[in-house]
């Protein structure tokens, strides 16, 4: 059974939750052993996969969890706005560390390495390639280039203003166009995640609402302050 077939089976059985285990950078939780513990807890709670940034985090998590890991490396580049897995060496390192799926930025922005080359390198390692996209055009272009999975990860993050709500219309448009879609980005409640499935998502990635304690506390603090004013 291929990994995609296994994921199809697991998603059908459990609903399709993927947990992004990426603490706020510099947080007390931003340690490989804590990231790995989050990943294990997510697996035990029914997640079909986890998404992890960084080689050290991935390597430690891989030793604990049996579910597939979507691996990424984030970089801040002077010459490009692309942050997610921008280099071929990043793909190689993630493959060696144990990623089953490698995600790359799939937007049509200036970049050090072409999306096509990154996807080909992922497939060279016999792994699944995921493209993190911001639009229908991005998603369809990446699908034509061979991406196995299209994520809505970058929707709302390539422009100055990020909306509060997730991009459900993008999920539907990509699904209707024949893409295997992972809905990601601002799915901060179970209701929104469920709505993504109704719009055609194959699975839904949730990050901040599960693994970023600072964000969750901020939401509660803002609500309490507003109620008290």
Curated annotation (Swiss-Prot):
Isomerase is among the record's keywords: yes
One example of a Gene Ontology biological process annotation: N-acetylmannosamine catabolic process
GO cellular component: cytosol
Keywords: Carbohydrate metabolism, Isomerase
Substrates-to-products reaction catalysed: an N-acyl-D-glucosamine 6-phosphate = an N-acyl-D-mannosamine 6-phosphate
EC class name: isomerase
EC number per UniProt: 5.1.3.9
Pathway: Amino-sugar metabolism; N-acetylneuraminate degradation; D-fructose 6-phosphate from N-acetylneuraminate: step 3/5
One Gene Ontology term of the molecular function aspect: N-acylglucosamine-6-phosphate 2-epimerase activity
Origin superkingdom: Bacteria
Record keyword Isomerase present: yes
Function: Converts N-acetylmannosamine-6-phosphate (ManNAc-6-P) to N-acetylglucosamine-6-phosphate (GlcNAc-6-P).
Protein family according to the UniProt entry: Belongs to the NanE family.
PANTHER family according to UniProt: N-ACETYLMANNOSAMINE-6-PHOSPHATE 2-EPIMERASE-RELATED
Protein name: Putative N-acetylmannosamine-6-phosphate 2-epimerase
């Amino acid at each position: 059974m291929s990994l995609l077939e296994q994921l199809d089976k697991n998603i059908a059985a459990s609903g399709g939750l993927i947990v992004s285990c990426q603490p706020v950078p510099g947080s007390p939780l931003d340690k490989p052993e804590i990231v790995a513990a989050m990943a294990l807890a997510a697996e035990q709670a029914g997640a079909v996969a986890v998404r992890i940034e960084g080689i050290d985090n991935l390597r430690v998590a891989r030793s604990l969890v049996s579910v597939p890991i979507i691996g990424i490396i984030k970089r801040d580049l002077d010459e490009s706005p692309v942050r997610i897995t921008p280099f071929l060496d990043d793909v190689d390192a993630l493959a060696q560390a144990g990623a089953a799926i490698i995600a790359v930025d799939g937007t049509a922005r200036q970049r050090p390495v072409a999306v096509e080359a990154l996807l080909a390198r992922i497939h060279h390692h016999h792994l699944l390639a995921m493209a993190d996209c911001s639009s229908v055009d991005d998603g369809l272009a990446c699908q034509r280039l061979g991406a196995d999975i299209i994520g809505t990860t970058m929707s709302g993050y390539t422009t100055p203003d990020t909306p509060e709500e997730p991009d459900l219309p993008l999920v539907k448009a990509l699904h209707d166009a024949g893409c295997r879609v992972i809905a990601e980005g601002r799915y901060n409640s179970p209701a929104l995640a469920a709505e993504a499935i109704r719009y055609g998502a194959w699975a839904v990635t949730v990050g901040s609402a599960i693994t970023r304690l600072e964000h969750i506390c901020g939401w509660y603090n803002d609500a309490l302050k507003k109620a008290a004013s």
